[in-house]
Amino acid sequence: LADAVENCRCAIHMAGSGMPGVFLAFNRKVILGTRASKVRTTSFHAFESINYPYVGEINSRGLDIRRSYIPGPKGSCVLERRLEEKVFLIKLVPGFDGKIFQFLYEQGYRGLIIEAFGMGGIPSMSSEIMDDLRDVIQKGMIVVVKSQCPYEGCNLSLYETGRTALDAGVFQARDMSTEAVVTKVMWILGKHWERKKIEEMFYKNLAGEISPQEEDMFYKGV
């Protein structure tokens, strides 16, 4: 069995709708590109929309587009080619050694995404992980913490370990997917902005990658 024909048909219908944006058409569903993530290797429902509704679906009437979930254009289309390739992704495991942060900094990495535990917890008791993390941030590295759980996002202000990380200067991914965070950091660092501008743009909803209420939490200081 193959689903290529059905996926192509769905993609063509979406392209013909005139809706702006980047989308993924798969298994009779359309996913906003900034929310798409591959979660299975062989199943027909291999892709899911992370923390966001599907923006389209094939039913008996054809392609049903949920226009209210599609972000409107914010200007003319511009092809961005300046991406920072020195961005690294780490998943925390028990026994993790924070010295890897310094190693990555010495190798020229400018951005680091850490997939932490639960709500975004980074072990800080009886370890030097937080000191190592704070050191590379002070040297200019941009560090983002997100949950290893793909759904429901992270809130570092909820527990002490998360608040300690925030005090060290990390950004939190809120409800963004891993793919969206990595891409966003590469794009932002390619701009060579100052840290204040980088932080502002990281928490700004650019293409539907972060939920509006999550964006509001940042600006309200929650």
Describe the function of each predicted region.
Residues 23-27, 91, 115, 146-147:
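Short beta-strand segments
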Residues 119-222:
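C-terminal non-catalytic interaction/assembly regions of soluble proteins
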Residues 14-15, 104, 136:
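Hydrophobic helix-cap positions at the C-terminus of alpha-helices
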Residues 1-28, 32-37:
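Short, glycine-/small-residue-rich phosphate/pyrophosphate-handling segment
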Residues 4-9, 40-41, 160-164:
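Short, hinge-like loop/turn segments at secondary-structure boundaries
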Residues 2-6, 50, 99, 107, ...:
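Conserved active-site and cofactor/substrate-binding residues in soluble primary-metabolism enzymes
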Residues 32-119, 124-126, 205-222:
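Accessory alpha-helical/coil subdomains and C-terminal extensions
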Residues 17-21, 26-27, 52, 83-87, ...:
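Short coil/turn connectors at secondary-structure junctions
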